[in-house]
Design a protein with these regions (language model features):
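Noncatalytic carbohydrate-binding groove/subsite architecture in carbohydrate-active enzymes
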Residues: 29-172, 179
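Active-site groove signature of glycoside hydrolases
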Residues: 1-28, 102-105, 110-111
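Carbohydrate-binding surface patches
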Residues: 245-294, 326
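Aromatic/acidic polysaccharide-binding cleft in carbohydrate-active enzymes
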Residues: 138-249
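Solvent-exposed beta-hairpin/edge-strand motifs
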Residues: 289-308
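Conserved, mostly hydrophobic/aromatic
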Residues: 12, 107, 176, 185, ...
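Conserved beta-strand positions
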Residues: 14-17, 61-62, 109, 141, ...
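C-terminal beta-strand-rich structural cap/linker in extracellular carbohydrate-active enzymes
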Residues: 311-334
Length: 334
């Protein structure tokens, strides 16, 4: 395809949700129910062909349907579970791919089914990160949308244009990055119908020859991250303190209040994303440790009409910031 159409694939993942038992029944899903041994054998063969043909495309091992299958088994058996250990522990001689050409030390997975109850949102990602770190493997979150078990926002059925879904998804992004260590984060699809899986809602006429589209707060909320955090950025530590100056353990994450994360882009610009999940305004005082950066521009997304990454002013270090209820702000260095 690169020679014929000029389209280069940097990455190729041959196996989608091999552990997703629910994918294997009916015509509407795309699961490929291969075992870890079958996946390892196929990837070694693909790697060999890539080397022989001087193709530098990187091969991703598989896209897991559930984080729990990456470090354990969940509604499947050992043949499709323990994926990190199977592919990147040298003791797993039948399935080890850590020294296979064109295969990065990278696992990819989908965050479906692990976002509720709230303790799962935290604990499952911590277990995933512990296993990834043990075997020195990176992680990408490569697909998710709202599903039936996301009951806090009414499940996946029925499109939602409001901050209810936008904040719920932003909380998932925060946990995938902060606790699972995701270096890439991807949503299921851009445009959809009457289901919470598209960033944009489409309305087609009966002939499918005409129609219209309408954006959602979810689309803009993702922009609070993707518009400002650029490829190659690194995440920076955040320390939260109370009014008496005492450090708050995991103070960057209150699942029903404020959640914040910070980043530095390759051009040196710094980015700070703050989610206010609460039903009331919150305030905080912002300190940038080295004090070099003096001014931050603020962009806000909320349920107000027109507040879609809207520039709403700027602040200086040590100034108090008010973040309105049920909103997301991004601070960017000027």
């Amino acid at each position: 395809m690169e020679k014929h159409d000029g389209i280069k694939f940097n990455y190729l993942c041959p196996f989608n949700e091999p552990d997703g038992h629910w994918n294997w029944i009916g015509p509407k899903q795309e699961g490929t129910p291969a075992t870890n041994r079958e996946i390892a054998r196929a990837i070694r063969l693909i790697s060999k062909e890539f080397v022989n043909n001087q193709i530098d495309t990187q091969i991703l091992v598989n896209e897991s349907s559930d984080y729990r299958c990456m470090f354990d088994t969940h509604m499947t058996n050992w043949e499709r579970g323990y994926q990190i250990q199977s592919f990147f522990n040298p003791d797993s001689t039948a399935t080890y791919l850590g020294d296979t050409p064109n295969v990065p030390r990278l696992m990819v997975g989908h965050s479906y089914w692990t976002n509720t109850p709230l303790n799962n949102l935290h604990d499952i990602r911590c277990q995933l990160k512990d296993t990834l770190d043990k075997y020195k493997v990176d992680f990408w979150q490569t697909e998710t949308c709202i599903m039936g078990n996301d009951e806090e926002i009414g499940g996946g059925g029925g499109y939602d244009f409001t901050m209810k879904t936008a904040l719920y998804v932003a909380r998932i992004i925060h946990h995938d990055i902060v606790y699972a260590g995701a270096r890439s984060w991807q949503w299921w699809r851009s445009i959809g119908g009457d289901y919470k899986d598209g960033l944009i809602r489409e309305y087609s006429d009966p002939t499918f020859l005409n129609g219209e589209v309408k954006d959602s707060k979810l689309m803009w909320a993702l922009g609070n991250y993707s518009r400002f955090i650029r490829p190659g950025a690194v995440r920076k530590a955040i320390i939260a303190k109370d009014n008496q100056g005492k450090i708050i353990p995991e103070g960057d994450t209150d699942v029903t209040g404020l959640m914040c994360s910070a980043y530095q882009n390759t051009d040196g610009k710094e980015v700070f994303v703050m989610i206010n999940y609460a039903a009331e305004d919150k305030e905080f005082t912002f300190y940038q440790r080295n004090g070099i950066i003096k001014n931050w521009k603020i962009y806000r997304t909320s349920d107000k009409d027109g507040e879609n990454l809207l520039p709403v002013g700027s602040i200086k270090n040590h100034e108090k910031v008010v973040i309105p209820a049920r909103s997301i702000i991004t601070l960017v260095t000027q």
